[in-house]
A protein has these predicted regions:
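Charged, low-complexity surface segments at secondary-structure and domain boundaries
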Residues: 111, 124-126, 142-148, 164-168
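Short polar/charged helix/loop
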Residues: 197-199
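Acyltransferase loading domain of fatty acid and polyketide assembly lines
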Residues: 140-158
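Mid-to-C-terminal Rossmann-like scaffold of FAD/NAD(P)H-dependent oxidoreductases
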Residues: 4-117, 152, 156-183, 189
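Flexible, glycine/charged-enriched surface loops at secondary-structure junctions
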Residues: 41, 136-140
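A short, polar/charged loop-to-alpha-helix boundary motif
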Residues: 117-136
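Short hydrophobic beta-strand that contains or immediately precedes a catalytic carboxylate
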Residues: 190-195
Length: 199
């Protein structure tokens, strides 16, 4: 047990190193349970983490694209930039979220979020969804707490679910930053920057 030991990644099942206090503490508890005659078992870690960098917060859970590619997973992703709470309430801040999911099963694989207030809350919801085995399209159905100072009627996690649902149903087609270079340059594609000044 400890934060410098190899463990099983909850999402991929692969052996990995996740040097975080939470898995180390869980392993310590499991070791103590077994020493005292129990039969606790460690089920792996998904590497949920959060860090403050000046005025920003960055958080992650599960796996990122690099890991998904290395594992040979057929995945897709959505990237969105919702506000942390209702924009008509003063002080709304934009966060950028990336949510990865397996194409065939819609199994949630991971998420990364960068922004101000509310990033920690959303990454914890996504970490719970991954651990509970929810599929990506079910994020839209989560019944999350709402009041204008804290969220929107459609929470950013719900919005990720709506976007995934629209993508899977074929209602939208998405292009990511890395796709821009391969778009036709014959005038058949128009790039339009729809970002707001806040974004």
């Amino acid at each position: 047990a400890g934060d410098a030991v190899e463990l099983r990644h909850y999402v991929t099942g692969a052996k990995t190193l996740i040097a975080l206090a939470v898995p180390a503490n869980k392993q310590g508890r499991i070791a103590a349970d077994n020493i005292c005659g129990g039969s606790s078992e460690y089920r792996g870690s998904q590497g949920s983490s959060v860090v403050k960098v000046f005025s920003l917060t960055a958080a992650a859970t599960g796996i990122n694209e690099k890991t998904a590619r290395a594992a040979g997973l057929d995945y897709d992703k959505v990237v969105l930039s919702p506000a942390n709470h209702a924009t008509y309430y003063p002080g709304a801040q934009v966060m950028t979220m990336k949510v990865l999911f397996e194409r065939s099963s819609l199994r949630l694989l991971g998420a990364q979020i960068v922004g101000g207030a509310g990033v920690d809350k959303r990454i914890d919801v996504l970490a719970t969804a991954i651990r509970a085995g929810l599929t990506a399209d079910l994020l839209k159905d989560l019944d999350l707490a709402y009041a204008p100072p804290y969220s929107s009627a459609k929470d950013p996690v719900n919005m990720a679910g709506y976007l995934i649902d629209n993508l899977v149903a074929g209602r939208v087609k998405q292009f990511h930053f890395e796709d821009v270079a391969s778009l036709p340059k014959d005038g058949s594609v128009t790039l339009l920057d729809t970002r707001t000044p806040l974004e």
